[in-house]
Amino acid sequence: MAEQKSSYGYEELLACARGEMFGPGNAQLPLPPMLMVHRITDISETGGEFDKGYIRAEYDVRPDDWYFPCHFMGNPIMPGCLGLDGMWQLTGFFLGWLGEPGRGMALSTGEVKFKGMVRPHTKLLEYGIDFKRVMRGRLVLGTADGWLKADGETIYRASDLRVGLSKDSEGQ
């Protein structure tokens, strides 16, 4: 298991994506370009909105990011689903960070609201994930609420983000 730190840099997140942080068969982040986090600035097992733990992270937006030319030509916008996926990525990372075994999978979310867009001129995305509960059984299930800020303005909110870790999920 990884040393339980309160922040992680990009190279450490890449190590997690390669399966080197939490051990074989356990939680991993995706590799770029699907990795939607550049650094975890704070993570704790306590605190947050529900006092069940939280994670804060950042993503540096670049005008030449891969999604801008194709979504949409002449009207570049980061797909909202990528911000939502970043929230799921962080929820799964938290479960692995807690030392829970198994491979991660996004399961569902309650309500998602988009109130703004990420454009090429946007500089910084900030994520906040506040945990409501972690259930431990055959499947480890994390439930959290999340938000995404673009240059300091909250533009996405998601309730009841659910990510599971399963020991039965074999990598192919």
Curated annotation (Swiss-Prot):
Keywords: Cytoplasm, Fatty acid biosynthesis, Fatty acid metabolism, Isomerase, Lipid biosynthesis, Lipid metabolism, Lyase. Pfam families: FabA. Its EC number is 4.2.1.59, 5.3.3.14. CDD domains: FabA. The keyword Lipid biosynthesis applies. It comes from the Bacteria. Pathway: Lipid metabolism; fatty acid biosynthesis. The keyword Lyase applies. The active site is at H71. One of its GO terms (biological process) is unsaturated fatty acid biosynthetic process. GO terms for molecular function: (3R)-hydroxyacyl-[acyl-carrier-protein] dehydratase activity; trans-2-decenoyl-acyl-carrier-protein isomerase activity. It is found in: Cytoplasm. GO terms for cellular component: cytoplasm. Signal peptide: none annotated. It catalyses: a (3R)-hydroxyacyl-[ACP] = a (2E)-enoyl-[ACP] + H2O; (3R)-hydroxydecanoyl-[ACP] = (2E)-decenoyl-[ACP] + H2O; (2E)-decenoyl-[ACP] = (3Z)-decenoyl-[ACP]. Necessary for the introduction of cis unsaturation into fatty acids. Catalyzes the dehydration of (3R)-3-hydroxydecanoyl-ACP to E-(2)-decenoyl-ACP and then its isomerization to Z-(3)-decenoyl-ACP. Can catalyze the dehydratase reaction for beta-hydroxyacyl-ACPs with saturated chain lengths up to 16:0, being most active on intermediate chain length. HAMAP family: FabA. Belongs to the thioester dehydratase family. FabA subfamily. Homodimer. This is 3-hydroxydecanoyl-[acyl-carrier-protein] dehydratase. The gene is fabA.
